[in-house]
Amino acid sequence: MGLFAVIDIGGTSIKYGVINEDGTLLETNDRDTEAYKGGLSIIEKVKDIIHELKINNDISGICVSTAGMVCPKEGKIVYAGPTIPNYTGVEVKKILEEEFNLPCFVENDVNCAALGEFFGGAGKGTHSMACLTIGTGIGGALIIDGKVLHGFSNSAGEIGYMMVNGEHIQDIASASALVKNVALRKGVEPSSIDGRYVLDNYENGDLICKEEVEKLADNLALGISNIVYLINPEVVVLGGGIMAREEVFRPLIENSLRKYLIESVYNNTKIAFAKLKNTAGMKGAYYNFKENFNK
């Protein structure tokens, strides 16, 4: 085996490329998902991408990371929300293996991003990791001894639905929640500002932005403390656009964690920030392929 097609299907864009056995991306590109056209349209687009990659590369396998709840054994979309209509039930693995006569393995996008960070990023060298992606919502993944914890019905790690202070954590600690709350207090449309605006103004001393950023960090820390008490991971990795501002969030989250974790647990809890950025999903899709192909 030599080269592999890696596909990362998100709600906005499909990132793709070719990776070698060492986990080095040799080429990458992206195109619009056009999710509104539905799940089968996306799969047709993925087929076109792989056909293109095969023109100049001897592809030995197909590695897919995708939005939605995935049954990794069947490579099937168990559930996808309204952002990708008619995606639930699509048998991604079966369709692509029949089209290309190549092995294909499929995994949830947050799990793939976590695998990427575990094997080649912020979690490298550890044995257990929790990964939270802070974006429009909050995605989560749990890795124990190098393997994604899927749970009985493949819903382990759906951290965004965890109840914190009486609400789903993604409704009070996501980037979209931060923007919405700041916009509401300032009397502007949420579409007129973004996370960068909030964080820039936080650093410039804006009181509203300061209060809302601190509130988000505290809610996030409370959620992290629940995860830590439950599975005691060696490291908690935080990713997503706003978490690129580690200098803002690290001190806030760590200060709040001191409130929520007993001292002995706090002292053994490491917070890290994602390193791989946009390539995490593609690299994780390859690590998932390698793990399953070698079983």
UniProtKB/Swiss-Prot annotation:
InterPro entries: ATPase_NBD, ROK. CDD domains: ASKHA_NBD_ROK_FnNanK-like (cd24068). It comes from the Bacteria. SUPFAM superfamilies: Actin-like ATPase domain. Belongs to the ROK (NagC/XylR) family. PANTHER family: BETA-GLUCOSIDE KINASE (PTHR18964:SF165), ROK (REPRESSOR, ORF, KINASE) FAMILY (PTHR18964). This is Uncharacterized protein CPE0188.
